């Protein structure tokens, strides 16, 4: 299968760059797959999992927390709000972090502190839902 160039970029770093066969992307209007010579496209992403196939045998999976995707003749670029390799995630740790965030919401005496704790909890719930754990 022909390859195309793909880059996954988070605010911290270039997460992945290279020639790939396909990338499955969680678009806000639905999941879509990009192959070589895909029509140009610019879209937003919802929290979800990106599947990157370098070859039939080599698959990379990342959780992304929203962002933008651009398909051009040069390839696919994803600018993600956050990108985490799936193998680095632990379901028990995510559940514990959700519980901690909910306790922080209950304990907060200032609206701003409560809002930040709720935002953290919501991000963790999105992660859990995207991973279906």
From Swiss-Prot:
One of its GO terms (cellular component) is plasma membrane. It is found in: Cell inner membrane. It comes from the Bacteria. GO terms for molecular function: ATP binding; proton-transporting ATP synthase activity, rotational mechanism. The keyword Cell membrane applies. It is a peripheral membrane protein. It holds the Pfam family ATP-synt_DE_N. SUPFAM superfamilies: Epsilon subunit of F1F0-ATP synthase N-terminal domain. Belongs to the ATPase epsilon chain family. F-type ATPases have 2 components, CF(1) - the catalytic core - and CF(0) - the membrane proton channel. CF(1) has five subunits: alpha(3), beta(3), gamma(1), delta(1), epsilon(1). CF(0) has three main subunits: a, b and c. Produces ATP from ADP in the presence of a proton gradient across the membrane. NCBIfam families: ATP_synt_epsi, PRK00571.2-4, PRK13449.1. This is ATP synthase epsilon chain. It comes from Methylocella silvestris (strain DSM 15510 / CIP 108128 / LMG 27833 / NCIMB 13906 / BL2).
């Amino acid at each position: 299968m022909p390859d195309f160039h793909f880059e996954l970029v988070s605010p911290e770093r270039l997460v992945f760059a290279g020639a790939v066969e396909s990338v499955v992307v969680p678009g806000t209007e639905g999941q879509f797959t990009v192959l070589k010579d895909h029509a140009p496209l610019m879209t937003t992403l919802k929290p979800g999992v990106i599947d990157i196939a370098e070859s039939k045998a080599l698959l990379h999976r990342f959780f992304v927390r929203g962002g933008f995707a651009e398909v051009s003749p040069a390839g696919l670029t994803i600018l993600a709000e956050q990108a985490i390799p799936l193998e680095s995630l632990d379901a028990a740790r995510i559940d514990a972090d959700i519980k901690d965030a909910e306790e922080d919401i209950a304990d907060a005496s200032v609206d701003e502190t409560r809002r930040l704790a709720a935002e953290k909890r919501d991000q963790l719930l999105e992660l859990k839902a995207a991973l279906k754990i």
